[in-house]
From Swiss-Prot:
Pathway: Carbohydrate metabolism; tricarboxylic acid cycle. It is a peripheral membrane protein. Its main location: mitochondrion. This is Succinate dehydrogenase subunit 7A, mitochondrial. The keyword Cell membrane does not apply. One of its GO terms (cellular component) is respiratory chain complex II (succinate dehydrogenase). The keyword Lipid metabolism does not apply.
Length: 93
């Protein structure tokens, strides 16, 4: 039974791969089309928006500070839970 299952699966895969060989000849991404004037204008750098551009070093530093604060808050919460459990155990004993 397992032999029949394996042969039927392999024959199915072989037949489906033969069907898709022609489709693989065409690129999956399609053809490259040059950008039009409107797209080029939208992608061009705009001088009026330059002051709103985020600076990579500043953003990286801010992310790092946020990560550190998150770790500190989580550690503080864990310590509070630990302290309350120990306090309850001390009262119960």
């Amino acid at each position: 039974m397992a032999f029949l299952l394996n042969t039927s699966i392999s024959s199915h895969l072989r037949s489906s791969s033969q069907k898709t060989d022609g489709a693989l000849a065409q690129s999956r991404r399609g053809f490259h089309v040059e950008l039009g004037a409107r797209e080029k204008a939208l992608l061009a750098e705009d001088a009026s928006l330059r002051r709103f551009k985020s600076h990579k070093k500043g953003v990286h530093r801010l992310k790092r500070i946020g990560d550190v604060l998150t770790v500190v808050v989580v550690a503080g919460c864990c310590y509070e839970i630990y302290a309350r459990v120990m306090r309850k155990e001390a009262q119960a004993a």
